[in-house]
Amino acid sequence: MSKVAVIGGGAGGMMAACIAAGNGHRVTLFEQNEKLGKKIYITGKGRCNLTNACDTEDLFAAIMKNAKFLYSAIYTFDNHALMDYFAGLGLKMKIERGNRVFPQSDHASDVIRVLTDELHRKKVRICLNTKVQEIVSDGTKVTGVRWDCHDTHQKNQIEAFDAVVAACGGVSYPTT
């Protein structure tokens, strides 16, 4: 069993942490905000448009001009696998106009709830208000992370990890 750090508590980070923990790793999830999934709350006007239910080839045609760089990722875990994953967590979904997939409740908070429940079931250590300042390396491999926690006023804490997943998100809404 190895120690894995996941940087970023958005959808990708929460899923990465769940999957790593499900594969037997000891996982710590670092999120700089006060709660997980902050950006999820605002997607789809607060309803959380999870994915699109169209065929994979149609998905590529609709969203990308040059999608080749995404082929291996999408064919490994496509939109239908994502829907199956959330269904397995107990999230009821519905498909609307344009094949858009939403939680049946129309509440993004339900998506965050099922992911957070899964993190707890998998015993993922969650560090909120904690900013990873550096991924530490010995020159050949990752050895840990250096983090600061706003809540506990801990600064420059270096913690050893065998692997690090960076799921830091984008800057579409920089305040999230």
Q: Where on the chain are the PLM-derived regions?
A:
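N-terminal Rossmann-like FAD-binding beta1-loop-alpha1 element of flavoenzymes
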Residues: 2-29
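Phosphate-coordination loops involved in phosphoryl transfer and adenosine-cofactor binding
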Residues: 1-3, 96, 129, 161
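Conserved N-terminal/central alpha/beta ligand/cofactor-binding core
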Residues: 32-125
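Predominantly flavin-linked oxidoreductase catalytic cores and closely associated redox partners
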Residues: 109, 114-176
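Residue-level detector of alpha-helix initiation sites
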Residues: 10-12, 35, 170-172
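Redox-cofactor binding/interface segments in oxidoreductases and associated redox assembly factors
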Residues: 7, 42, 166-167
